[in-house]
Amino acid sequence: MRPALLLKGFEVELFTGKPSGENVGVASEVARQLPGFVTEPDRRNLEYITEPEASYDRLEEALLRPRRTLRQWLAPQGLTLLPGSTLSLGDSDRFERSDPTNPYHSLIEATYGTRVVTASVHINLGLTDPELLFAAVRLIRCEAALLLSLSASSPFIGGQLSGQHSQRWRQFPLTPEHVPLFINHRHYIDWVEEQLATGAMRNERHLWTSVRPNGPDRPHSLNRLELRICDLVTDPADLIAITVFLELRVMALIEQQSRLDPLCSSELSLDDLAALADQNDAAASRISLEASLNHWQDGRSIRCRDWIMQLLESMEPTAERFGLLERLQPIRTLLKHGNQAMRWLDVHAQGHSISALLSDGAIAMEQQELVIHGESAALG
């Protein structure tokens, strides 16, 4: 009998637009007509959330089903789903409000402008034990740059090269500016209440960092880890592989907390660890897998690609025990051939336009939605 897997789910943001890659905002209309879709402050992107699933077969179908539904709605209007995590061909200087009457959206536009008009995927892992949850948040905060590097898909902005592999993370307003590594649940509660009192956070959701604890009544009632750093990963096999990588890393922590919790096993102070994690994230946003990072254990320099490979090799026996070895294999392909941003930049350097890359990517997304791993959705 296989060990139990964690519950997990996705929060997926998507851009809509023309097959040629230009952004066209229809989020308000979609949210009114299609259950399960919600608007973002800008109408050019929208969001859906999957229900928690332990099974990766069911999780993959939960990921793809809303995309198919949305695609059917878009097609008669000559629109499609677009890859990428920034306004690759869109007007990045102009905000297009999805709800002009919403005061919170007014605040977002006035404070951040189009820096928040991005597409991403947040990965949630169910963890109800507070001690384990905060240990996992600490570890994944210190290794979040690895997951950003695997997912990077935003090398373009406004029809130009951005100079970054993840322009989304480069421009996204981390809020508050400095977030500590939380020692425990009480530390987190006290810190959030202090941020709310000073106005550094406008509400309990206004914690925009690479990873955070989440739950039905933040900051008090928590039941999951939310990884927020990843760019949009449109290939379901790649996203599932990244999720398996994340889950197996947390599983290793559960089995070896004293060795893998940075609070217990790092030579650095918590303040230094927080600074190191943020610096690694910034380095990964620039050149992703080629970035030189610093390891949380002792601050030593290590290439991002090499660090991921070390972890991958260490977790493959556990992946086999959980029946997840095949699901994990796309990580090796990403390390060999590059993430979406790197592959796009290689093809762009050969003379292909951004429009052509987005058009090909949109077609690939549609083809990927026809593939179901494991059982047929009709049986579920």
Task: Identify the role of each PLM range.
Residues 85-89, 129, 231-233:
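Active-site-proximal loop/turn and secondary-structure-junction residues that shape catalytic pockets
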Residues 1-79, 92-93, 101-105, 170-380:
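C-terminal accessory/tail domains of diverse enzymes
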Residues 84, 104-121, 125-187:
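Metal-dependent DNA replication initiation modules
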Residues 88-90, 154-165, 262-271:
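Short proline/glycine- and acidic-rich turn/helix-capping motifs at secondary-structure junctions
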Residues 7-15, 40-49, 78-89, 113-124, ...:
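Core alpha/beta catalytic barrel or barrel-like domain that forms the active/cofactor pocket
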